[in-house]
Amino acid sequence: MGGDGDGFAIGGGHVPHAARRNVDITYLLFDNGIYGLTKGQTSPLSAVGFRTPTSPYDNPDRPLNPLLMLLSHGASWVGQAYAGRPDHLHKMITQAMAHRGFSYLHILSPCVTFDKTHRTYANLGMQVRDLPADHDPSDRLAAMREAMHDDTPALGLYFREERPTLGDALDGLVEKSGGELPG
């Protein structure tokens, strides 16, 4: 588990490698678009023009697109949920944890302390939509196209593929070596 600031700033360098190696973990990222623990500083996912105590004249930076990033890094399971829909969120967490391999669940979660205007429960509740019923979660390019619609975030399973995990690959190397370490 992590937040948008930690996950896509300080800790962002580890995510691509865990995804591409298909490490068997579930990464739940809570995105409130702000560093709530540092008194409302903008995060890598804060919107352009967002005002905070540390950016009183608007945030000039474009936000990253985490779904698109994880899809391009090779994550084998990518989904998005919203804290304002707890039943759907529970279903998505359960699916992510059941997936064998790297699963990433992006959770839109308002910061009720430092964002009383932009990303509130009321605003997000009107913006989010479900992925289209005919969306094919085995099609990475279709998932990327959906991820590009960050002005109307879609909830649901964007992408899923079954492939060997890092643990499987390492087991294969041990088997290939006859269980012997070189040296």
Q: Model-predicted segments: where are they?
A:
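Short coil/turn connectors at secondary-structure junctions
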Residues: 20-26, 30, 74-75, 99-102, ...
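Short acidic, glycine/serine/threonine-rich loops at helix termini
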Residues: 10-14, 20, 37-42, 115-120, ...
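Thiamine diphosphate
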Residues: 1-36
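Flexible, low-complexity linker and terminal segments
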Residues: 110-183
